[in-house]
């Protein structure tokens, strides 16, 4: 057995992987600015302190915390009914008494749906469905929200697309004066807000009040130098949403990189490159934590990162995909690692602004995201950002499989002579992400 196979075997059989995953789920949803997030951060600190031979640091930054005080959507008219809902992060507060208006049901809420409705949207409440989060034709809820604002909507409702009383949540507003009130609904709530049989529009009242305060947030960093000056960056976010346990998204990724670091720690000093692990927070708030961190790196520090491997939602389906961020050379590298370990990966080339790898790619650093269930809308991955994102959705075998696959990429990058893949210039990177900023 060669050293790589021994490493992967040790990770597969490590009981600490499942222990850490369960412990992270025990902390709750880890919504930023809450006790749940703080408990998770302290847990990760404790686990990192147990690993010998690593350097530990913290990247501390100020940000404005937002929390929900009032959170209500009501169907108006005969048989008035209050619906299960969840205000979306940074929703604008409604005026006293709430925002009342007619509801325009835009179906999936893709650009063509907005253009078809046109002026009907102005001054009314736009209702759209949440897309399956990872697919070739996925439109992010933030784009739908921006279109709602562009077409003059007074409010925005995002509904989960399938039955089950699963309320949708997520980040969409920008904390700017142009924001509009926004809330997530369940499929069943949206069904009550569709166009009436006589062709009239349903009416609803949105009531949202948030609380805002400035706090400090913390990215946790751990690193082990290798023989050379370059680094392999391994990242995952530990924050989440407060509807459930944020198990798939992203206790899976955080537990995985803990185990990879634990297993590789004694081996990295003999590798060509060092290993730097980052546990990011505020990922669910527009990728803020990694944005701040990567932007604060010097040009030399960014050029010293050979590749970023980002783990986010690595269970929920047995099938794994690599989002290669438009770095075409990464595709052959991914295929090569897959061939070495006997595992196929679906490769998705277009840049995706859906996790922390994006902030590396936009600064010229080759970056990939490992994710389960791409283009599998019937998989358990579709339950992220809902009350059903709980630990039972991540079978042990899938979590182990995702962790071992990630470790294979990291091991290859640590030991590969010469560049992993070329970096991009600032101009090339800007062109790559044009339209996503």
Positions of PLM-derived features:
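N-terminal capping segment at the start of a domain
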Residues: 2-35, 166-172, 176, 239, ...
